[in-house]
């Protein structure tokens, strides 16, 4: 469950940074890509927990 909560928090942060990126903030795009990579790793962990 802890992994799922972390994913929810990362998704909220990703949403904020993605919105900022589309408004022209290029550094928010970098943060969004970093968050995407973190989410990918957490999703792999969650997948392992489910199996």
What are the residue ranges of the model-derived segments?
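Polytopic transmembrane helical bundles with strong interfacial aromatic enrichment
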Residues: 3-4, 9-19, 34, 41-51
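Short, surface-exposed loop/turn segments at secondary-structure junctions
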Residues: 22, 26-30
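Short, charged, amphipathic alpha-helical segments
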Residues: 29-37
């Amino acid at each position: 469950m802890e992994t799922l909560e972390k994913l929810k928090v990362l998704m909220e942060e990703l949403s904020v940074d993605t919105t900022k990126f589309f408004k022209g903030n290029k550094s928010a795009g970098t943060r969004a890509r970093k968050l995407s990579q973190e989410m990918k790793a957490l999703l792999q962990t969650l997948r392992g927990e489910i199996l």
